[in-house]
Every structure is written in structure tokens, then in C-alpha cells.
Amino acid sequence: MGWDSPSARLPMLLLLLAAPLSFDMKEIDTKLGVGYAVLIADVDGDKKPDIIVADTDRVVWYQNPTWKKRTIIQGKTKRDNVCIAAHDIDGDGRLDLALGADWRVPFDTSKGGTLQWLRQPKDPDKEWDVFPIGEEPTMHRIRWADLRGDGTMSLVSGPLMGRDSTAKGNWEDGRPLRLQAWAIPKDPTKPWKAETLDESLRVMHNFAAVPSSSGKGSDLLTASCLGVHRLSLADGKWRLKHVGTGDQSKPKGRRGASEIKQGRLKDGSAFIATIEPWHGDSVVVYTPDKAGGLWTRAVIDDKLRWGHAVWCADLDGDGEDEVVIGVRDNLSREDRGGVRIYKRDGDGWARQLLDAGGVAVEDLAVADLDGDGKPDIVAVGRATKNVRIYRNTGKK
């Protein structure tokens, strides 16, 4: 679990070793189907964060601190379940879930892709009720966000691809994909209405809600084949600004960016961490351009295969965020799938291999699970079919 330098030729990697963070690993499940998405939220209202996983044909949760597994739903949606987001949708004081399902492989860009919400019952051992929200082919990622800065949460949904896109056309020959926001109706069991925020991107693997540049509510950062963009509300209209190029080395292949999160440096300035290109092999950090142009792009690791998750969090309490990366596949015996942490020191970044080969990361999340003030990491594995908790014990 020591810090190392993935590649001396990469411009922002430190060659000096740094003090590694210490984690205790606990495996709480080894029988997932795929484990498409993991979420940390307080399901039962006891002020302790629980773990929620969207699996192939079910949604389950693990109760903190025993990690007893309970089934939320099974077989109530069109498989596969692919994305999940938590919010008290009906206002009864209990946490509910939005769920994207009917994920199809091979990709079907003309039909499929359902969006629904799950209402939590009073009895935690009963399955939850399912209510439809909408449909969009290749429904892939969802997030709750306060888009207008008035405290009202909307469900933002993004498909992977635009309608009628084809493999022959590099999934870019159909209509642009629709990034939509769904307002909760007065009676959420009734039909929901969607607002299209943007319809210009192609192959958007993920997006993140971040503090708005106006100081109220949230903007959206997108990772697509066109690179990194910021979607902001200005004068009542949603405007898309190009922030980063992404990896454009293969214009007819997988390109752009894939996973995305925003972090903070010690001076308070933001940085953006991505996996590039789509399902890519590089960890990239963007920092703002002083002249206001495209952000400066720096590859900090290129020794991975199929990066599939990113998070930014201050793991060591020094006032600056680290980057946590989940890797799905093995590149070599030395560079395996798992969980990696990147820490900034001066002008460089150093890498810590937290778990090399023990979890083929499909998704990960970071939050303080035990109330000790230190963020912990939860990762779910696709090929490994497991859920692992990495409890942050601090520096060695």
C-alpha cells in the first residue's frame, strides 16, 4: 500500500515517496451479479451511512454497522439495473431511490432504458414499491441536483448515447444525447415531466453535479467523447462551456473523457479529475487556465486498463482532496484492477495502490462510515462480484 510513481515520464508525477494512508479492508459480500452502482446514504434514518448497490436484477442495501444485507427490490424492473440516486422523493421523511434500468448490451439506441423511483416502506424488511418516471434509450447515469439554487432537487438523467447511434458510426452518427432534468410532481406516483438541459453531446459516460459558478445551486460537469464541459444556468438558459479536451488521439475510436469528479486544492481552487478516454487507460487532472481558456490537462497515470470510477475527497485531513480511482481490468501482472489513491505534493502527484487485484471496480463511493471524521471508501467489483469497505485509519 505504499506510494509509488507510475511513470517517470508523466509531467505531474512525483518521483519521491510520500507517507501512505492506512486502511483496513472488510469484504461484506461476494455474491453480486454485476454491481453496476454503489451509493452511500442513510437508509433507515439512524444517522449512520448505509451502503446501497444496484445489481443486475435487484437493489440491495447493507445496514451500518453490522452490514446486514436487505433486498430493496428484486425482479421488479427490466434488467439490467444500471444507476441509482437517493432522495426523499415523497416527503415522508424516509429515503427513497431513483433507479435507471433496462440497460442493454449490445447497445440498443432505439429503445429500452427506463427510469423509476422506489418508495421506502415503514418495514425495512419489506420490498419497496416501484413507480415509473420516464424512458430514454441507453439510460446510464442519474444524479439529484439543486439546479436553480432554490433548494428544490431535480433528478438529472443522462443516456450513454444519442438515439439511433450505431457502432459503425462510432456511436456518434445518431441524434445528440439528451441531458434531462425531472421535477418531482406534487404527487410523485403520477407522471413526471422532463426538461431538456442540453442536446449537443455525444457518448457521455458520466456527469457530476458541482457548486454553481453563480454561487447558488449546482452546475453539471460532463465527461463525453467531446471532452469535459460545464453546463450552467445563466439568464434563464442552460449554456455549455468547453472546459477540457479529453483524449482525442483516436478520433474514430474511443475518445474524450469517461468518469468525472471535482476536487479542491489547499488554496481553495478547483481541479477536475477524469478517466480518459471512454473506458480509458489514463487518470487525468485538469486545473484552471489563468486566462480563462481551456483548463490545463495533465496525465498523472497511464498504467491502467478500463478505469471505471473516480472520486475526490480529503482522505488525510490536510485540507486538500486526494483522487480515488477504480480500475476494472488488469493491464499486466504489476498493474492490476482495483483501487488507487493519488495525492498531490507540490506540483506533482504520487500514487498509492490500495487494492491491486482484489476488486474489479465497476463503481466506488467515499464517505465517513464510522463517524471518526475520516472518509472511507466502498468499492463494488464486476468480475469479482464483491463489495469491499476500506476503513480509513489515517497515515501510517
Where are these regions (language model features)?
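Beta-propeller-forming repeat regions
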Residues: 18-396
